[in-house]
Amino acid sequence: MDTVRIAVVGAGVIGLSTAACVSQLVPRCSVTVISDRFTPDTTSNVAAGMLIPPTYPDTPVPTLKRWFRETFQHLSEIARSAEAVDAGIHLVSGWQIFRSVPTEEVPFWADVVLGFREMTEAELKRFPQYEFGQAFTTLKCETSAYLPWLEKRIKGSGGLLLTRRIEDLWELQPSFDIVVNCSGLGSRRLVGDATVSPVRGQVLQAQAPWVKHFIRDGGGLTYVYPGTSYVTLGGSRQTGDWNLSPDAELSREIFSRCCALEPSLHRACDIKEKVGLRPSRPGVRLQKEILVRGEQRLPVVHNYGHGSGGISVHWGSALEATRLVMECVHTLRTPASLSKL
């Protein structure tokens, strides 16, 4: 087999980063990204894009930390390059604050971000309702820039972007030899995974250019994340809620919570409401599977279920998915091909 034809289903940050990795690292392959929605209409476009990873009950912390470290290193290289502005990657410093001392005073990712330390008493005076805090510098990924930048890289490597709704992965055979499923919440329908479900997130995007530092409540529900074009104010976690229409009452509550952390936000203007459905799952699904139908076999690599952590671990999980794709490619190019998969 000469050129291996690879289809990546899904065009959010997981799909595009996986396609970019495969294009870059897998020799003699063609890559086509297939999705019914591309930027700016993906869930990833609503994401605040702060690199602060969550935990998942069924994903081991060492694995999660590796993905986060690889993602942080990848984006740090971009942030130090001339591509930083086009890719929408920059450093941002700030505080994570707690009303009481957390059980885990040092999170697993503390040695990956920059300058992680406990907040001083002087810093905590800014937040009188909080008694403990952490200060650090992390990266912010502006998805409105980063997703088009990834698309450009994919096309620059000879990849294709195809707007199409896939109802069944078997539609992609025999046109493709390997399928990479990065369909996020779509995997509930596409591969019948009932463990992936929506967690509705509503945020506000406001003009407040004087806000330079991020502020994040330790629970992660309330946050103020400054970006290059606007400040993201959040947020909500509504499990099982499929509603994509903004809730005006919730917007008022979010704004009130954020103003309690940063009173100057009362002067913010041009406030927009955004809603996204996070593809939540007990653990990220990153594995190979062989679909069998009669005599036909279709190698599939799954990479979905990142919930609120997609931006934080996208490159690390894309690298792992690419390693699985390479295993599939090796088997296809070996006599007695799919029997070993």
From Swiss-Prot:
Keywords: Cytoplasm, FAD, Flavoprotein, Oxidoreductase, Peroxisome. GO terms for molecular function: D-aspartate oxidase activity; FAD binding. Optimum pH is 8.3-12.5. Expressed in liver and kidney (at protein level). In the brain, expressed in the frontal, temporal, and occipital lobes of the cortex, hippocampus, striatum, diencephalon, brainstem, cerebellum, spinal cord, plexus choroiderus and ependyma (at protein level). Also expressed in the lung, muscle, heart, spleen, small intestine and testis (at protein level). Its EC number is 1.4.3.1. FAD binds at D36, R37, T43, S44, M50, G307, I311, S312. It catalyses: D-aspartate + O2 + H2O = oxaloacetate + H2O2 + NH4(+); D-glutamate + O2 + H2O = H2O2 + 2-oxoglutarate + NH4(+). InterPro entries: D-amino_acid_oxidase_CS, DAO, FAD-dep_OxRdtase. Induction: Increased in pups born to mothers fed D-aspartate during pregnancy and suckling; not induced when mothers fed D-alanine. Optimum temperature is 45 degrees Celsius. One of its GO terms (cellular component) is cytoplasm. Its cofactor is FAD. Inhibited by aminooxyacetic acid, malonate, meso-tartrate and potassium bromide. It is found in: Peroxisome matrix; Cytoplasm, Cytosol. GO terms for biological process: aspartate metabolic process; D-amino acid catabolic process; grooming behavior; hormone metabolic process; insemination; nervous system process; regulation of cell communication. Transmembrane segments: none annotated. The keyword Flavoprotein applies. A motif (Microbody targeting signal) lies at residues 339-341. The keyword Cytoplasm applies. Belongs to the DAMOX/DASOX family. Selectively catalyzes the oxidative deamination of acidic amino acids. Suppresses the level of D-aspartate in the brain, an amino acid that can act as an agonist for glutamate receptors. Protects the organism from the toxicity of D-amino acids. May also function in the intestine. Tetramer. Interacts with PEX5; the interaction is direct and required for localization of DDO to the peroxisome. This is D-aspartate oxidase. It comes from Rattus norvegicus. The lineage of its organism: Eukaryota, Metazoa, Chordata, Craniata, Vertebrata. The gene is Ddo.
